């Protein structure tokens, strides 16, 4: 996919500045207000090569938006608490509220790629299938998810690194992040290409950006953000209207008629019940031990009517388990 990006894209600086400062700046603020009014949450993932000036792209974009409506995250590593939780727990906690926006300069993709270059005992574990499933949950939940990758040439990356090292304002930032790409361009290009091929899905496609010229990159990102959020707000609003609860009682009864299909006449005699209870409690005990040694976690959820027997079912289930694990 990266080979499809035209890194030679150029635009006249005067025209580009006018479009960025006036037209696109206004449009970015407008689509943010529209998303807020509709109650649609937005997630922007800004990935790319190291030294592709993503911070400047994000910083410029935020100048045109209401700071009360967005949060910017840069997930470069997991702390000890994060490591004890499922991989995506960190990101679930950072999801924007309805109408708000979360922007990632580094996201779950950065941490996933770190696996290939970090020491094995420091790596975090997930797969592209897990990422696709996570993103499908987001888009199914009506989050507007936009993913960008800032592509650049090896020569431009080296030039940007030199410029950054010369900039005193960058001196506070540690230069030893999870990995350094300079000098390993082909290795990382292969890694990024595999990542995008595996995660370029219909519900969450990648938008590839030409990053050799910073102003062109800003133009491409901002234009796409405006276009995609506009489309997403229209779809979100239409879907919301279609799902508006009906005031017709008979229609509502049909919607929840699934419970009438449950066979409540089923019974089991006491002897059979006792025999099967002991049998399956023994199986549960063995499975718990196996899960413990394999490091597999489990969650059991019980829902139902009051006095339906949920408490009794839980007691019989836990009676077969070791309470310490």
Question: Residue ranges of each PLM-predicted region?
Answer:
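Glycine-rich phosphate-binding loop of ATP-dependent small-molecule kinases
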Residues: 1-325
């Amino acid at each position: 996919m990266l080979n499809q990006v035209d890194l030679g894209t150029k635009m006249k600086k005067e025209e580009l500045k006018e479009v960025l400062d006036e037209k696109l700046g206004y449009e970015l603020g407008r689509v943010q207000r529209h998303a807020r009014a509709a109650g649609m949450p937005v997630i922007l993932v800004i990935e790319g090569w190291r030294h592709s000036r993503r911070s400047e792209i994000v910083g410029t974009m935020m100048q045109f938006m209401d700071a009360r409506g967005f949060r910017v995250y840069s997930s470069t590593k997991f702390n000890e608490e994060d490591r004890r939780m499922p991989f995506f727990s960190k990101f679930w906690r950072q999801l924007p509220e309805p109408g708000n926006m979360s922007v990632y300069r580094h996201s779950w993709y950065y941490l996933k790629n770190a696996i290939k270059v970090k020491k094995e005992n420091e790596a975090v574990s997930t797969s592209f299938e897990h990422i696709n499933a996570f993103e499908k949950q987001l888009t199914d939940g009506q989050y507007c998810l936009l993913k960008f990758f800032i592509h650049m040439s090896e020569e431009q990356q080296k030039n940007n690194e030199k410029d950054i090292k010369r900039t005193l304002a960058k001196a506070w930032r540690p230069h030893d992040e999870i990995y350094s790409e300079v000098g390993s361009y082909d290795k990382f290009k292969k890694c990024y290409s595999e990542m995008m091929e595996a995660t370029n899905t219909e519900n969450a496609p990648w938008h590839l950006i030409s990053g050799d010229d910073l102003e062109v990159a800003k133009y491409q990102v901002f234009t796409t953000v405006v276009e995609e959020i506009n489309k997403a707000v229209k779809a979100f609003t239409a879907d919301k209207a279609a799902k508006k609860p009906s005031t017709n009682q008979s229609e509502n009864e049909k919607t929840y008629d699934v419970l009438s299909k449950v066979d409540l006449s089923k019974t089991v005699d006491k002897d059979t019940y006792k025999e099967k209870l002991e049998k399956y409690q023994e199986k549960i005990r063995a499975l718990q031990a196996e899960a413990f040694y394999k490091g597999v976690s489990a969650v059991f959820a019980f829902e139902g009517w009051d006095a339906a027997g949920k408490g009794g079912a839980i007691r019989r289930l836990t009676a077969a388990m070791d309470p310490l694990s």
